[in-house]
């Protein structure tokens, strides 16, 4: 059971809720804060004070006063009119993350909602009812209005949801789970949709996948090093300590561990004096991506525990302030950085693929073909990888440098953070396929060298992946191999259990 309190949710907690489906509850202390904040809203409505979003319209209509008898209609109309999302729905994991993050944000006690609304969010999580939320339509300020409006639609029994593997009207899922739709009152519609939970949820999923992919890239690169009889000296501890980046040192240490008893690696001067940069500089390049991942994780965990509503209620209602915490710029920047970090893993991987298939760069059969000329082997796999890498470069253009004014220029600067998160997710999917191509080529190269000469770790990895992708004995439709291995990479932890603690804790000499 994961307990939410509005301030201590971590990426590890989120992973347990999103992928292990651990149930969620709210802490008693956080619910007390929510009750006090709600009491302030009810006083404001009764006293007919002029407070944005409670007794006024929204955006450019902030100067329009709303009568207290119209308060519920105001919130319902807000949800209906703002549910303007378009395009394919977010993956269910993202929808689930949005429920989690919105509940956690409301539990900070600054938004003025009833505890019943938080109960509804948690009930959807625990019953695995996931709103259908279109991916496109958010400017990333004033928060993720359109996506979160579709989430709110589901909470009030409208719209669609994913439930038990099917897409259906929300009302059908509520009938099957004996849940009742929520009825929104003062401030609650605004509190649900004024926030950054779409970009943060998408960014969280992208980060979790990118972290796994970064580890996988090192293991696949280790197979490539063996397939190319790479020089192990470049991973020596002293050279990386001389530069001082911890992430670079960590990557080098993991590579040394993976290849510790390999008979396929060489030393400088044995076959050549130096390897190409795509081999020799793996710790420097991959380590830089790890640095970026650390930054992204830090910003995500702040935002996952942030109050991003407007206005916010402080001191039990004595202070109510309209501000701009809904602005997604911090996450927009983080996601743009994540795009670059993931794209670079694909860039260097594709160059290693070229070194595996180009007969001018190795002593392997041309394109790793079993019968060069008659059969093309891995020739077009490199094309596919190059295409994905090029697409990544286009997607990596920063979304956060763009802004288009909206709401009659009241909202005259926006973050485009949700676009950045969506593109990060796509780049990571592309990078996974590039790494799958590298793995297929590395497997074939190692097979030519003799897999019995592999290090103990990479030999186990070789056999695990050979269960997914068989040896290339003749040309076949390699698209299937790429997709199957990519799917496996997405699902597998990729760390043999007996090595997990050594590699992932300080006991193994690593800081990560």
Swiss-Prot record:
EC class: lyase
Q: Name one GO biological process term.
A: L-histidine catabolic process to glutamate and formate
The annotated pathway is:
Amino-acid degradation; L-histidine degradation into L-glutamate; N-formimidoyl-L-glutamate from L-histidine: step 1/3
Principal subcellular localisation of the protein: cytoplasm
Q: Which keywords appear in this protein's UniProt record, sorted alphabetically?
A: Cytoplasm, Histidine metabolism, Lyase
Q: Where is this cross-link: 5-imidazolinone (Ala-Gly)?
A: 141-143
Q: What is its EC number?
A: 4.3.1.3
Q: Which reaction does it catalyse?
A: L-histidine = trans-urocanate + NH4(+)
Residues that the record marks as modified (2,3-didehydroalanine (Ser)) are 142
- Record-annotated disulphide pairs: none
Give GO cellular component annotations, separated by semicolons: cytoplasm
Q: Where does it reside?
A: Cytoplasm
Post-translational changes noted in the entry: Contains an active site 4-methylidene-imidazol-5-one (MIO), which is formed autocatalytically by cyclization and dehydration of residues Ala-Ser-Gly.
GO terms for MF: histidine ammonia-lyase activity
Q: Source organism's superkingdom?
A: Bacteria
Please give the CDD domains that the UniProt record associates with this protein.
PAL-HAL (cd00332)
What family does this chain come from, according to its entry?
Answer: Belongs to the PAL/histidase family.
Protein name (Swiss-Prot/TrEMBL): Histidine ammonia-lyase
């Amino acid at each position: 059971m994961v307990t939410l309190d509005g301030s201590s949710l971590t990426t590890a907690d989120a992973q347990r809720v999103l992928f292990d489906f651990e149930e969620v509850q709210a802490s008693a202390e956080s619910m007390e804060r929510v009750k006090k904040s709600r009491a302030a809203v009810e006083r404001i409505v009764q006293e007919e004070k002029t407070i944005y979003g409670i007794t006024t319209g929204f955006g450019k209509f902030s100067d329009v006063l709303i009568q207290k008898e119209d308060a519920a209609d105001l919130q319902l109309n807000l949800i209906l009119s703002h549910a303007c999302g378009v395009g394919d729905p977010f993956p269910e994991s993202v929808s689930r993350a949005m429920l989690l993050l919105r509940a956690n944000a409301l539990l900070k006690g600054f938004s003025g909602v009833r505890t019943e609304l938080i109960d509804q969010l948690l009930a959807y999580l625990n019953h695995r009812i996931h709103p259908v939320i279109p991916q496109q339509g958010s400017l990333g300020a004033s928060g993720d209005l359109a996506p979160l409006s579709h989430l709110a639609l589901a909470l009030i029994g409208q719209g669609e949801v994913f439930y038990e593997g099917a897409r259906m009207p929300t009302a059908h899922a509520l009938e099957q789970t004996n849940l009742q739709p929520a009825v929104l009152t003062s401030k609650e519609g605004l509190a649900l949709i004024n926030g950054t939970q779409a970009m943060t949820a998408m960014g969280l999923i992208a980060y979790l996948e990118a972290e796994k992919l970064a580890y996988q890239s090192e293991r696949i690169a280790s197979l490539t090093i063996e397939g190319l009889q790479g020089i192990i000296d470049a991973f020596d501890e002293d050279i990386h300590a001389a530069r001082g980046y911890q992430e670079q040192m960590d990557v080098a240490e993991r590579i040394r561990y993976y290849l510790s008893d390999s008979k396929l690696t060489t030393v400088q001067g044995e076959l050549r004096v130096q390897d190409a940069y795509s081999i020799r500089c793996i710790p420097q390049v991959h380590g830089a991506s790890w640095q970026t991942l650390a930054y992204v994780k830090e910003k995500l965990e702040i935002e996952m525990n942030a109050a991003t509503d407007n206005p916010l209620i402080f001191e039990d209602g004595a202070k109510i302030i309209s501000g701009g915490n809904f602005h997604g710029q911090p996450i927009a920047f983080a996601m743009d950085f994540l795009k670059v970090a993931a794209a670079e893993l694909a860039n260097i991987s594709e160059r290693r693929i070229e070194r595996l298939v180009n007969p001018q760069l190795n002593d392997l059969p041309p394109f790793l073909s079993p019968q060069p000329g008659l059969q093309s082997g891995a020739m077009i796999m490199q094309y596919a990888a190059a295409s994905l890498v090029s697409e990544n470069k286009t997607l990596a253009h920063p979304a956060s440098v763009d802004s288009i004014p909206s709401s009659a220029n009241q909202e005259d600067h926006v973050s485009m953070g949700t676009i950045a998160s969506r593109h990060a997710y796509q780049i990571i999917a592309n990078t996974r396929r590039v790494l799958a191509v590298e793995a297929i080529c590395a497997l074939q190269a190692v097979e030519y060298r003799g897999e019995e000469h592999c290090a103990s770790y990479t030999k186990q990895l070789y056999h695990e992946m050979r269960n997914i992708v068989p040896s290339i004995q003749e040309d076949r439709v390699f698209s299937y191999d790429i997709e199957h291995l990519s799917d496996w990479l997405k699902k597998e932890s990729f760390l043999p259990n007996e090595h997990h603690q050594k590699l992932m804790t300080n006991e193994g000499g690593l800081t990560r």
